[in-house]
């Protein structure tokens, strides 16, 4: 009587190994937690500038303050999250983490999984910032800062900003350089808002704000969301080309 052939152990595939390694990295990554206090400090500083009599102001006046405050705070939050997304991948590349990870998972798995965790981290930081801002404004004025639908779209815009920074980081791979390049890709929309509003309306920052419903001038939400997606697709295509050439995909 012959015994059944031994079944070879089933090994984990490259994507599973890459996901497991990335989850371990995210749990111990200090970078998001270093940015979180700075982000909360920014929110508290802006709220401290609100007039003390806001709580007894008429509802239209409070709504006007809410519009200006939300646009200002979330513009800054988008910029911070984008820089964080770029720093994560560039610091990993400089430390050799990406090169080592590709020995087991390959570029597609490594960069794809890192993009997903960057998106999730951006959504987490954006959610914490939005809840803190909403709570503080509610206490100060007695009214909500953003309707639930607008808050959801704003969170999506913050997630897109994290991906934007990540893709810029994949292209550049320099932690110092992304501190200047990422803002340079977003800030011009604010600088051109008064000089050339039609041009500013199609730039990345303005399309993200408009898609979230935080900008009450220019293109509508659907058109802005489509343009923002187009920007991400173009940048993503460029990042894929760079990865294919630099990382020998």
PLM regions and their residue ranges:
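Short helix-to-coil transition segments within interhelical loops
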Residues: 100-108
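Short, membrane-interfacial amphipathic segments enriched in basic
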Residues: 1-19, 196-202
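Hydrophobic/aromatic positions within or immediately flanking transmembrane alpha-helices
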Residues: 99, 111, 179-180
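Membrane-interface capping segments at transmembrane-helix boundaries
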Residues: 240-249
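Transmembrane helix segments
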Residues: 48, 173-209
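Secretory targeting signals
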Residues: 5-12, 30-32, 36-88, 111-175, ...
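Short helix-terminus and kink motifs of transmembrane alpha helices
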Residues: 87-95, 193
């Amino acid at each position: 009587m012959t015994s059944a052939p031994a079944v070879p152990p089933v090994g984990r595939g490259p994507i599973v190994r890459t996901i497991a390694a990335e989850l371990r990295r995210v749990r111990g990554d200090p970078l998001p937690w270093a940015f979180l206090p700075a982000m909360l400090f920014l929110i508290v500083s802006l709220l401290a500038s609100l007039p003390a009599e806001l709580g007894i102001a008429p509802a239209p006046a409070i709504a006007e303050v809410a519009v200006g405050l939300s646009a200002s705070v979330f513009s800054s939050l988008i910029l911070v999250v984008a820089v964080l997304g770029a720093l994560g991948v560039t610091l990993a590349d400089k430390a050799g983490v990406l090169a080592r990870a590709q020995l087991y998972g390959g570029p597609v798995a490594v960069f794809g999984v890192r993009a997903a965790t960057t998106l999730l981290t951006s959504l987490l930081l954006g959610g914490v910032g939005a809840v803190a801002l909403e709570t503080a404004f509610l206490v100060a004025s007695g009214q909500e800062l953003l309707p639930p639908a607008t808050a959801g779209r704003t969170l999506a815009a913050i997630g897109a900003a994290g991906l934007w920074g990540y893709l810029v980081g994949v292209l550049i791979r320099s932690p110092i350089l992304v501190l200047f390049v990422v803002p340079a890709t977003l800030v011009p929309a604010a600088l051109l808002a008064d000089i050339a509003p039609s041009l500013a309306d199609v730039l990345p920052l303005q399309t993200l704000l408009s898609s979230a419903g935080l900008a009450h001038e220019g293109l509508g939400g659907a058109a802005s969301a489509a343009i923002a997606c187009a920007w991400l697709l173009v940048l993503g295509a460029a990042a894929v080309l760079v990865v294919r050439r630099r990382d020998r995909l």
